[in-house]
Amino acid sequence: MRCLISYLFHSFLIFLKFIRSDVTALTLQEKRKKSRLTGILMKSMANKKNHQQKKSTDGSTMNGNNATATAAATTQNSSQIGQNSNSSHSVTNDNTSSNNASTSTSSITSTTTTTTTVPSSQQSQSQNQYSHQRLSSTSSTSQQTGISKFPAKKAGHNELEKTSNTANSQSGAFKGTTNKDRPKEKEKNTHSGNRQSQVNHNHHHSNHVSGNQQNRKNKNRDHSNQSYRGGYTHNHNNYHSLENAKSSGFLSNSSLSSAGQISASSAPPVSTTPTAIPIFQESKIVQTDPPVEEAKKKKEKPKIKRDEEPMPYKSTDPKNMDSVMAFKEHDEWDKVEFMCELVSFLSPTDLRLLGNCIEGSVRCYNNQMRPVEKTSNCSDPTAGLPQFVCSPPPPPQQVYYFPGIADAALYQTRNAVNSVFVQQHPPGLPPLLGGMQNIMYPPDANFHHSTSCTTPSSSVSVANKDVNNVPVVLSSSVNGISNNIPSDRQQLDSKPNTARGSSGNINQSNTTSPEPEPGSNHISTTAANPAHPTSVTVPQSVPPVPQEPELFLKSVLDLTSYIYTLMAVCSSTNRKSAAKISDYVQNVILREKSQILERIPDELDKITVLQEIGKIVAAMTHHPAITLDDKMKYAALRDGLRAQIETLFRQYYTTQKQLEQSNLVVPSSQAVGDENDTDSDHESEEEFEPLSGVMGSRFESNPVQPSPSVPGTFFIIRFIGRQIEKNDNLFSLEIHWSDGDRTFAQRSRDQLKALQHRLLDEFGQQRSEKYLHQGCTTSYSSFDDDNKKLSASTSTMETFAPNGERIVPRLARDATPAQYVQYINELSDLPARMMLSAVICEEFNGTRAKTEDLLQETREASDGLIYSRWKNPRAKSPVRYFKRNATGSIDPIELPVNMQPFLYSNIPQTQVQTLFPSCSNCGGPHAPKHCEKQTLLSKKGDHRTRSDGEGSQQNGGTSSSNSYAPIHANLPHAVYIENPQAMLGSNHFNHHQQQHIIQNTIFHNGGQFRANGTYEPQIPIAYYHAQGTVQNSNNTGGVNGNSGGGNQNSNF
């Protein structure tokens, strides 16, 4: 035991000797290394002085900031050497030395690195992040020395290499270092401000190449301070660092930055030479302003981005808006279109939810909408509406008015028309909002009147029939006629009359003022013209009050709004009422649309009327009670209405309209929507503008209608072939056009073969080829085999590619129906020049023909050429139309068509006889809307929302809901019967009858709400007795035999 203790004691002593010798060797080696480094430092300082003198001599080639920076660095390094030489053997702590470089005792190695262009704090901070931290520091404490595993000689050798590299980079290659490494130093400087507390002075690397590589890899690691400092400066003309100008609030380790600028340091004063103070001040003054300005600009960029963040509902772009807000931006017509179109995208569950929401919202309007709903679903909903809005045109001899002639006849005509209107009232018409007690539409005796001077409105209420007398009607009608006299026209061109006639309409077009009573119209007319009496025989030469066109506009808007309401509340199964409303819209509103627009002077008011008509058309298009034929007509009418609205907008914003508004309304300012300044030519002719503006507004009353014969900018983009059932010889073609139109045609086998032969005769030699060019495959066609060139739409270079398949698809002589359908579909792959050729145009452009275009062709002489289709694309060969008369027989009607010479005419097409469809309800030779037989939907009952209040008593015996089948037909005794005798055998069948009655009342009470709880019938239950039961085969006494023997369920 003693031997073991003595052995351990001797081994411990040996270990202490070994450690002491190791520490002594390291201390000596460190002293030698420090002495060597001091000598190298003195040499590098001498080289720097020589370089500074050289830079001062040739200042034109070097930057002045570099000289001052070098001098400042030299003086600072000399002061640091004197300070650190006294404390070279002290112990260093990383955490304390990172905050203040002058107060902490650092090693000579860290002092040497201050001579480089990179500060020691920045370079050591960048080196701690890199992966090549293999070398340990030689200036560590005694604790770190014991842990280090590197030999002292190797560490000293590496340190010497680092120091020599630093000195060489400072002395030998100073120019290249300053020019190449300064942009990279700026990137290093931007990272060092936030992480000064993490710097390790004992682990560093002085090599510039490795430092730059490290900084390049860790460049994007921490940019938390970039928004504060303004980001990287990519200006290589100025190498000033912006770190110290934009301090981040942390203390700096070095008192001098790499750019020659004093950093904000809290170090105690160091004894330096007096020459260093002006150098420091000069280095501050040398700092130029552009980097600071750039830093300010870059610093302001994030603030601008924060200020420009899009606010909610700030822009009117629908993509940036809420869907509800975007919906509210549209006009009334588009809102109706969106509502009806979006319903088709809903699922059945969503539709039920929407129906419940609508039912809950409409419930409060039941009493208000009940009379309109009753009128809309009656047998004749349009009985009380006027048969025409504007009167038919007068005979030609009444164009000019002569006093004392035809007054009596004109008065009688007007009186008769007004009496017809006054006696007709819509049944259940609710009072319209806006002051109009009744809808009256003035007949116009003068068809060729001006737009600014219109005939007055005869919309007189029923209560004021006595006001609707001769002076009111004839005074205004005389004005409408007398306005066509040229002498009166000259009087209208005066300033007061034009300002009263035109500017009043413009100012009052958008704002609807409360209208006075019809009696006040007569008073205002006589008050405005006191010199002219209001008798029958004396005409008035002054224009009428401009309020009367507004009365006409108001009455038209009320009529269109009422028709839209009628169509909206019409039941979805009431096809008869919907057909009559549709007929009224087609025969009255749409037929007199141009005359209505003529009587409205302002373009904006015309657009408002057209949008109201568009709402009606949209409701007709989507309403389920409208027939498919009418829906197709209304769908085709929508494009024309939108084109007319666009034309009116263009007319409103034309230069002539702007000049007219600027001269008539506000002479000193431009009109609404005026974008261009007034030219000198317009200013020189300013005195003639009011005359031309008023005259132009009269004679240009008709808006430009889109001509049906538009030049041919359309072509076929797709063919879809289908085989007609039970007929292998006929095929139907669905043709899609580039303008969005879709037509249908029917061709037989022989007609398709003839089309194939014509295509082969025209384009049989053209081939489809493949050309490979740099890995890109493109297809093109050649015109013939000898000269293979590309088409003009692609290129004109020659090619020697091999022959490919021909462009025209192949069709075998004995092709099957499936191959014919495939051939029709392959025609869609023909190039555009073939689609626009005469073969395709003459074959399929006739499918775009419409009846109104054919009637227009009869009035217009055709030039007889093949390409006359381009002038009138929907023209086609002569057609025979067939129509059924009242007896059901076919009455063919041949329309006169210009027969062209056969050589220049279109190819005759096979006409399919189209008969008017028979009634789908009774099979009679009439339209379904004229059928008098009750339909199946009418028998089932309507599906409209009930307008009765909740909890109202319903008579179960007379309710139409009893026609429905019960939900639970075989529900066994769900409700108890008060009469116990009903459960006996003789009354068992009566009991089940009573069960069905109760179930119908519970589950089918018209959809009315019923509170939870026991059912209490409102009507006394009628019990059926034995005489109404079914006789049983085993029953001999006339009583139900269930009580006796036999099968108990024989009656069921």
Swiss-Prot record:
The gene is gls-1. GO terms for biological process: germ-line sex determination; meiotic cell cycle; mRNA 3'-end processing; positive regulation of gene expression; regulation of translation. Trans-spliced exclusively to SL2, suggesting a transcriptional coregulation with the upstream gene dhfr-1. The keyword Cytoplasm applies. Residues 424-732 are annotated as: gld-4 binding. Residues 1-25 form the signal peptide. One of its GO terms (molecular function) is RNA polymerase II complex binding. It comes from Caenorhabditis elegans. Expressed in the germline (at protein level). In the early embryo is expressed in all cells, then becomes gradually restricted to the germ cell lineage and enriches in P granules (at protein level). In adult hermaphrodites, is expressed in the mitotic region, accumulates during early stages of meiotic prophase I and is slightly less abundant in maturing oocytes (at protein level). This is Germline survival defective-1. Residues 41-320, 478-543, 667-689, 933-965, 1033-1052 are annotated as: Disordered. The keyword Cytoplasm applies. Disruption phenotype: Loss of maternal and zygotic expression causes germline survival defects. Zygotic mutants show a masculinized hermaphrodite germline. At 25 degress Celsius, hermaphrodite zygotic mutants show small oogenic cells that are either arrested in pachytene or have undergone abnormal meiotic prophase progression and failed to arrest in diakinesis, often resulting in endoreduplicating oocyte nuclei. Residues 892-1052 are annotated as: gld-3 binding. Required maternally for germline survival by forming a maternal complex with gld-3. During hermaphrodite development forms a complex with gld-3 which promotes the sperm/oocyte switch freeing the translational repressor fbf to turn off sperm promoting factors. Required for proper oocyte differentiation and oogenic meiotic arrest. Stimulates the enzymatic activity of gld-4 and together they prevent gld-1 mRNA degradation. One of its GO terms (cellular component) is cytoplasm.
